[in-house]
């Protein structure tokens, strides 16, 4: 049977490259679970996994629909938010020590807030440049403001969706 470090390292590598991989069933770890060298290696695995996830998410920004179609943008926006929710699941994983979780959550709050601001800025610039019809641009901007990326920072984000899915499966 694999030890906790191997289990976490394998799960993080898989999670970083496979959007369907989960972090469920990982053993809890504490700051004392490993010697300092192994602890640093595990932190590197976490950092690498988050970096890959962030890069993949940033690539979605390049796929920002350059269209006046509100519904296409809405679908893209909700998918984008759900991808960030996956990142938050790692940052807030109950198996991580409080110190690590606190640091990851603080970093996530800053990054996601910055991304929200960046997207709002893009939409404001496109409106000024006249790339979107005024009414559609306003609806898209309102959507981004009323359903912000920062919603994923709430630990209960997605709970209702998961419950609904579970009920539909039963």
Question: Language-model segments: which ranges?
Answer:
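Short intrinsically disordered terminal tails
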Residues: 1-2, 167-170
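Conserved S-adenosyl-L-methionine
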Residues: 161-166
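Long, low-complexity or tandemly repetitive, helically biased scaffold regions used
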Residues: 9, 16-154
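Class I SAM-dependent methyltransferase "Motif I" SAM/SAH-binding loop
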Residues: 157
